[in-house]
Amino acid sequence: MNPEKPLDVKVNFTNNHKFKNITYFPDSIRALLIGSSNSGKSTPLFKLLLVNDMLDYNNLIILSTSLNQKEYQLIIHGFKNKLTKSDILAFIQNEDKFKTDDGELLPINELCETFASATKPKGKITIIAVNKPEFIPHPDQLNSKKKNLCIFDDVLEQRQNIISYFTKGRHNSCQSIYISQSYMHVPKGTIRNNCNFLILFKLDPTDVNNIHEQIVKGDMTLLEFRQLCNLVWNEKYKYLVIDKYNEDLNWKYKDGLFKPLKEIDKRLFDNINMIQ
């Protein structure tokens, strides 16, 4: 071998299992979903999980102390019984049809089992649901041939394996959504710094100021950002989305998942475009 001859080494870092998320979403989601109790956080979460072609995944991992929530129960028992996203979403949207004469929802596990027995569904999404951080596998232990999605729902106890999902998860074919009641309660040096998608319900001024300082200030002034937040949050249960690394400002800031900045406030959109 000639030591003077340069080596021609080509390393392929391409993920053979690239996620096919919906247009205008990052190729791989590392999301923060922030909002106080009863703000409506479950609405975008279950929309992301259950609307077809929204997020691309076939293995779901949920860490939550609220697994008894009926939507979680439907997802857990639904996927375990091979129901599809559409099947589970239909249950949620038609909940009244599955209630007893007393107005009580039929047992969800029995509901899913009965539906599966009658229809022989062909859903292929697998699921793991746990209520303690130590039961979550390290991302290195995930099957990288799967398209993994992990939900961390109001986890008060921080563990290294949770943090690793935001620092290493994308290298192990895993997307993540971290749910918290406060932006400032999310660990900064690890999870906050590595997120690329923020879903923000009405926040207190401290959180708004910090998000502007850490993410938004290169695009608009603090006053403009406050105005944008107020325009979105003027109705209950509405939320602002920031697609952190989207270079198209019209789609970087959205009212909900799909309403772009230009449709929220054209004057603000024109102003910040003049500055860029």
Language-model regions: role of each:
Residues F79-Q93:
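Acidic, Ser/Thr-rich peripheral helices and adjacent loops at domain boundaries
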Residues M1-K20, L67, F79:
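N-terminal pre-Walker A segment at the start of P-loop NTPase domains
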Residues H17-F19, I29-L55, T65-I76, N94-L223:
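Conserved P-loop NTPase motor cores
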Residues V11-F13, L89, I125-A129, Y239, ...:
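Generic preference for hydrophobic/aromatic residues in regular secondary structure cores
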